Each structure stands twice: as C-alpha cells, then as structure tokens.
Amino acid sequence: MLSRTAAPTKASARTLSRAAAEQCRTFATVQDGSANPVRHYGGLKDQDRIFQNLYGRYPPDLKHAKKMGDWHKTKEILLKGHDWIIGEVKASGLRGRGGAGFPSGLKWSFMNFKDWDKDDKPRYLVVNADEGEPGTCKDREIMRKDPHKLVEGCLVAGRAMNATAAYIYIRGEFIQEAAILQNAINEAYADGLIGKNACGSGYDFDVYLHRGAGAYVCGEETSLIESLEGKPGKPRLKPPFPAAVGLFGCPSTVANVETVAVAPTICRRGGNWFAGFGRERNQGTKLFCISGHVNNPCTVEEEMSIPMRELIDKHCGGVRGGWDNLLAVIPGGSSTPILPKHICDTQLMDFDALKDSQSGLGTAALIVMDKSTDVVRAISRLSHFYRHESCGQCTPCREGSKWTEQIMKRFEKGQGREREIDMLQELTKQVEGHTICALGEAFAWPIQGLIRHFRPELEARIRKFAQENGGEALAGGWQRNARQQGKLVSPGM
C-alpha cells in the first residue's frame, strides 16, 4: 500500500513521500506528484455552513428559508449575467458532488457554445435527485429540510447556462421529499421567484418535478434523460453529449442536487470565499453521510480535506467500541473500493487524497465497519445489488455482474480455489472501462478493493473449507457428492 507519514496533530497536513507519489501517479488528479496541494483547513464556523437547516430545526417553507438567507439578492445575481455566475463558480473550485468530481463551472459553460443565442431550441437544466447509491442520503436531507436551496439553485444554475426550464428527476421512493419539494416550488411560483419574470429580473424560468420508478441505473445522466423522455432507463452512447443533444434532443446539462444547491451561496458570498476551505483542487464544503458501526450515524456539512478519523470522532461519537475496533471503511458510497484501518488512520476526505489511496470520494458516504463485520459477505451483498440493478444493455456488465455475484456467494462459504481470486480480479478488470455507463466500474471496484486489502481473509476461508470437507471445492462450487445428491445444476445458477 501507499506509505504515509503520520502527523503529530490532526490539524497538520499528511504528505505523500516521493516514492509513494510515483506509485500512485495513475490514481492522482494532481499531475505533479512532488507538489502537495496547499491546505487551508480548520476555518469552518457554524455560520459558514451553507445548509443551515440540515437537522430540521425550522419548517422547510419559504418564510423560514428567507430568514436563513435564501432568495437574498437573487435578482442581482441574475442581472449580472451568465458569464459572471460561471466565473464565480469557476473561482470557487466547485466540483460535481454526485461522484465524478468534474469542475462545475467548466461543465456549465459548455451550454454557452458559439452562437448559442441563435439556436431557437429550448435549453434545459436537469437535476439528478435519483439518489440510490447504498449509504448515500445527502440529497434526501437537502430536499427534506432545505428545499428552497435547491429551487433557488435551479434558477441561478439555469441562468448560468441560459436554460429555459429545470427538470428535477427525483427518486420514486422519495415520497415525502417529493411532496416537500413540490410545495417549495409552488411557494416560489406564488411569490414570483420563478416562472415568468423570475425575481423581477426579466428572465423566464420554470421548474418541474418528475418522479422516477426506482431504477438505480437512472442515476447515470443519459439513463436519466431517457427515463425523463418516457423511454426505458438505459444509458446512451456518447458523443453526442447532453450539452449538444440532451433532453428531448435539446441542449441540456445534468447536475447533482448538492452541486446546484450551493450555487446561490457561492454567488452571494463569492467564489473566493468558498475556495478558502479545503485545499487546491478540493475546495469548499461538502455533505458527508456517515453510517454503519458508529455511535451516532449522521449527515453533516464539513470542509473538504478533513481527516477521516476526525470526521467520524467529531460528528459521530467515534467508531462503536473505539477506533481500535475499526476494520474498514467504504469512503464514498458502495461503488468505491474499501479501505482498511491502517489507511483510514491518516486518510484525508477529498478527491485527490482518496485517489492516491486507490479509492474515491464518490458521494462522500462513509460506511464504517467494525471488527464484527464479515467483510466478504458485505462485499458479496453489494455484488448482489449491482447484479440486480444492471440494465442489461452492455454484455460485460450484464454477464460480469452475474458471474461476480455467483463467485462472491461461493467465496462467502469458502467454496473456491485460490487461483479463482486472481480470476475474479481479472474479470473485474475486463469489465472496467468496457461499458457505456459507469455501472461496470461500480460493481468491479468494491471487489478489487476487497482483493487488494483482504485477500488473506478469502484465502483463509478457502483453507478452512478444504480442512472441513476433505479438499477444496470443485470448480463452479460443485460438491464432491453432487451426483449422489441428484444435483445437476451448478450452485448460484
């Protein structure tokens, strides 16, 4: 694994050695491995937090939203124009909060291509509220507690890309959240904040709410667009990209709920204010969802680059049974590779630091596992989830997810051979990068993380099974007395 130097205090920066930087070059966003990003950590105060009603202290209505600063000087922001808004978002260093981490200002600017104003097609902002990643619940909290942040964010982000309307595609299971968000949209219309002449700015902008039907794959932007158009939720080949041919064949941009919701605050307080938190290329604040074996599971807003251990100890009351009882953490939702305790000890929570550790920030949903966890069974359960949610369009994903689930079920019981571990690793590598959307990587990476860090556990189960059953399991999980038992179908089929 990558070598890290332990820090004497939790406020000091963790730096990679030159050798480790060279080793992780392919995983790092930072191109110069010798240059450590400047870190500005420790300055976040309660009044700096964007989502002031994250814990539901006040009703999620327009009256209380205005008291907490929402819709303040929104007209002035709109009148400054799209170039100014995009400039502030670029200056803030905001990166997509849905998992990919693409620079938001750059992504939004793609909508304002040359001669865009001569194109008579409508233009759309599509908000991805189809939050289905296991362990992730940040967008749900925004829509349930701070819906006006999202509605105002749609208006500001829509102005940045000169959109005519926003479609919020919300997960079908979010019944309460959909009702609260629709009420916030109705309040904004009634107050003249959206619709014709939004906020008195002369800019017309509509917001529509569309409920999905529960498919995880619709969290991918082109699958979401297909579903929004009334088609089966299956991803499109790119190019053309949505900024050119998106929803209903019109220029569109798909953005995450959290990404859109922070835009008005960035414009009000300034991009440089937002960039003052975290470190270079990893700026701003972020919603972290912490679940699993902690004393107080929660969703909390913290600044980027906070140490993982401090995040868990400060907001969750620590790991159940103490930090020494920690086994591993999945740091960014179920699709990111698992990290063992010795890495978590000094791990920073941002895009680059987690790439250096061969994982990812993803949705910043930490799933904490203590030493009572059956880690093989946990990853096997994720394999079942991704097999179930595969849309079946791409052969590597359709077939690969089925086979990885079957192999992981056998590994749970020790019914395998050591060479099958390498075969499983190779199978995931063959799927990775060979599918239309990222679901192929989503089911491959957790297994790769398991093999990378917990291979001895897999081997120990295989040896234990061999000792108890007179030898290793036969290929495919067949038992030696299968014929006598009348079993003619391989396990898992």
UniProtKB/Swiss-Prot annotation:
<dbReference type="GO" id="GO:0051287">
    <property type="term" value="F:NAD binding"/>
</dbReference>
<dbReference type="Pfam" id="PF22461">
    <property type="entry name" value="SLBB_2"/>
</dbReference>
<dbReference type="InterPro" id="IPR011537">
    <property type="entry name" value="NADH-UbQ_OxRdtase_suF"/>
</dbReference>
<keyword id="KW-0411">Iron-sulfur</keyword>
<keyword id="KW-0679">Respiratory chain</keyword>
<dbReference type="InterPro" id="IPR054765">
    <property type="entry name" value="SLBB_dom"/>
</dbReference>
<keyword id="KW-0004">4Fe-4S</keyword>
<keyword id="KW-0472">Membrane</keyword>
<keyword id="KW-0809">Transit peptide</keyword>
<keyword id="KW-1278">Translocase</keyword>
<feature type="binding site">
    <location>
        <position position="437"/>
    </location>
    <ligand>
        <name>[4Fe-4S] cluster</name>
    </ligand>
</feature>
<dbReference type="GO" id="GO:0008137">
    <property type="term" value="F:NADH dehydrogenase (ubiquinone) activity"/>
</dbReference>
<keyword id="KW-0560">Oxidoreductase</keyword>
<dbReference type="GO" id="GO:0051539">
    <property type="term" value="F:4 iron, 4 sulfur cluster binding"/>
</dbReference>
<keyword id="KW-0285">Flavoprotein</keyword>
<keyword id="KW-0813">Transport</keyword>
<dbReference type="InterPro" id="IPR011538">
    <property type="entry name" value="Nuo51_FMN-bd"/>
</dbReference>
<keyword id="KW-0496">Mitochondrion</keyword>
<feature type="binding site">
    <location>
        <begin position="212"/>
        <end position="259"/>
    </location>
    <ligand>
        <name>FMN</name>
    </ligand>
</feature>
<keyword id="KW-0520">NAD</keyword>
<comment type="function">
    <text>Core subunit of the mitochondrial membrane respiratory chain NADH dehydrogenase (Complex I) that is believed to belong to the minimal assembly required for catalysis. Complex I functions in the transfer of electrons from NADH to the respiratory chain. The immediate electron acceptor for the enzyme is believed to be ubiquinone.</text>
</comment>
<dbReference type="InterPro" id="IPR050837">
    <property type="entry name" value="ComplexI_51kDa_subunit"/>
</dbReference>
<dbReference type="InterPro" id="IPR037225">
    <property type="entry name" value="Nuo51_FMN-bd_sf"/>
</dbReference>
<dbReference type="GO" id="GO:0005743">
    <property type="term" value="C:mitochondrial inner membrane"/>
</dbReference>
<keyword id="KW-0479">Metal-binding</keyword>
<feature type="binding site">
    <location>
        <position position="397"/>
    </location>
    <ligand>
        <name>[4Fe-4S] cluster</name>
    </ligand>
</feature>
<feature type="transit peptide" description="Mitochondrion">
    <location>
        <begin position="1"/>
        <end position="27"/>
    </location>
</feature>
<dbReference type="InterPro" id="IPR037207">
    <property type="entry name" value="Nuop51_4Fe4S-bd_sf"/>
</dbReference>
<dbReference type="InterPro" id="IPR001949">
    <property type="entry name" value="NADH-UbQ_OxRdtase_51kDa_CS"/>
</dbReference>
<dbReference type="GO" id="GO:0010181">
    <property type="term" value="F:FMN binding"/>
</dbReference>
<protein>
    <recommendedName>
        <fullName>NADH-ubiquinone oxidoreductase 51 kDa subunit, mitochondrial</fullName>
        <ecNumber>7.1.1.2</ecNumber>
    </recommendedName>
</protein>
<keyword id="KW-0249">Electron transport</keyword>
<keyword id="KW-0408">Iron</keyword>
<comment type="subunit">
    <text>Complex I is composed of about 40 different subunits. This is a component of the flavoprotein-sulfur (FP) fragment of the enzyme.</text>
</comment>
<dbReference type="Pfam" id="PF10589">
    <property type="entry name" value="NADH_4Fe-4S"/>
</dbReference>
<dbReference type="GO" id="GO:0046872">
    <property type="term" value="F:metal ion binding"/>
</dbReference>
<dbReference type="Pfam" id="PF01512">
    <property type="entry name" value="Complex1_51K"/>
</dbReference>
<feature type="binding site">
    <location>
        <position position="391"/>
    </location>
    <ligand>
        <name>[4Fe-4S] cluster</name>
    </ligand>
</feature>
<keyword id="KW-0830">Ubiquinone</keyword>
<comment type="similarity">
    <text>Belongs to the complex I 51 kDa subunit family.</text>
</comment>
<feature type="binding site">
    <location>
        <begin position="96"/>
        <end position="105"/>
    </location>
    <ligand>
        <name>NAD(+)</name>
    </ligand>
</feature>
<dbReference type="InterPro" id="IPR019575">
    <property type="entry name" value="Nuop51_4Fe4S-bd"/>
</dbReference>
